């Protein structure tokens, strides 16, 4: 690659409108550094802002979520027609590689070996890849169904450890508490030395592998929250164990954020999990179950769920579950549980 090479990086999952959540495409940031190291001039775009006027030699189109894959492929086709050499990739393609192949692209759905190990200072970091949580039915379903979590198949069921990364305030590792003790110490020591005012372990810890010594180690960082999941009723005992450990070291319950997927169990079980999180004075983070090949449109559901019920349940769980049972929820209620003026009654 010469210094005249022009590279375009397209983030197909970039939010179409501003959201209150945090968003960062680490793959795009690493790809930019890799292309620059090859001497390329790098430009960035989204499917709505890119140009297919033939001004780029190479292009990489990334999709984090499966429902952005069709837009990513359309963008890739336009760029290919303009004469650019185009690659597509990202976790969104995990269950959709055959779709990409049918349209002429060999999708890189696992961490790209060129980009993943590219050094640099990023807003987020992986100190490890993989997840050995064999007890998790989302990544390791026992009934032969397709997994809802892609991490074990995409990154491996064993942890791959990295010790040559630059610390960042957002830690993305999928299962920190299952990492070898020495590697956890390395992460904490280097992150602490970086002097960040706040640190977020975004994917968090696994209840089954969380121990008192885990809490004692990670409490030395200025964590914005202690994050872990309560995704199945069967995890209740392990979740309570973690809460008890955090109580022992003085962590306030409001600093505990518990992920809770909705739609993987019947409504009654999912509601029980959310209401228990509220009863424990912790913060629920309710997420809707989506198949890994979900392309958008009507959402396939199982058990006694409908898409409308899932949407309502997520809003109830995150905003109003402290005030009422799900049966009393009305979409017309505001965040304080007050019905807007002039609205009707009932659901």
What are these regions (language model features)?
Residues 1-98:
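A short, structured N-terminal alpha-helical element that caps or precedes a catalytic domain
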Residues 9, 58-66, 90, 140-242, ...:
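Core AdoMet radical
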Residues 71-78, 99-100, 186-190, 213-217, ...:
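A short acidic, amphipathic alpha-helical/loop segment
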Residues 217-227, 232-347:
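A structural motif corresponding to the C-terminal lobe/cap of the Radical SAM core domain
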């Amino acid at each position: 690659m010469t210094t005249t090479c022009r590279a375009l990086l397209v983030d197909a999952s970039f939010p179409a409108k501003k959201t209150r959540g945090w968003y960062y495409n680490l793959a795009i940031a690493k790809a930019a550094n890799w292309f620059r190291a090859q001497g390329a001039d790098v430009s960035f775009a989204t499917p709505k802002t890119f140009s297919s006027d033939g001004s780029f030699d190479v292009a990489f189109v990334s999709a984090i979520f499966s429902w952005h894959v069709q837009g990513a492929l359309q963008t890739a086709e336009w760029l290919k027609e303009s004469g650019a050499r185009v690659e597509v990739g990202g976790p969104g393609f995990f269950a959709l590689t055959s779709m990409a192949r049918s349209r002429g692209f060999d999708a890189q759905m696992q961490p790209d070996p060129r980009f993943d190990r590219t050094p640099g200072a990023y807003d987020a970091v992986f100190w490890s890849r993989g997840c050995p949580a064999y007890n998790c039915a989302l990544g390791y379903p026992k009934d032969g169904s397709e997994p809802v979590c892609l991490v074990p198949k995409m990154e491996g069921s064993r942890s791959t450890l990295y010790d040559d990364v630059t610390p960042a305030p957002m830690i993305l590792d999928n299962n920190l508490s299952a990492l070898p003790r020495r590697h956890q110490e390395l992460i904490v020591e280097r992150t602490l030395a970086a002097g960040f005012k706040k640190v977020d372990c975004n994917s968090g810890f696994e209840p089954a592998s969380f121990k008192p010594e885990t809490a004692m180690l990670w409490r030395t960082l200025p964590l914005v929250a202690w994050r872990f999941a309560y995704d199945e009723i069967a995890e209740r005992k392990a979740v309570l164990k973690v809460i008890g450990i955090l109580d022992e070291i003085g962590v306030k319950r409001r600093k505990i954020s518990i992920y809770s997927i909705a739609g993987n169990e019947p409504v009654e079980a999912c509601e029980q999990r959310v209401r228990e999180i509220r009863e424990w004075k912790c913060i629920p983070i309710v997420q809707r179950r989506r198949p890994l090949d979900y392309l958008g449109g009507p959402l396939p559901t199982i058990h006694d769920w409908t898409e409308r019920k899932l949407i309502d349940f997520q809003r109830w769980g995150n905003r109003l579950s402290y005030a009422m049972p799900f049966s009393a929820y009305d979409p017309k209620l505001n965040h304080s549980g007050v019905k807007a003026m002039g609205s009707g009654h009932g659901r």
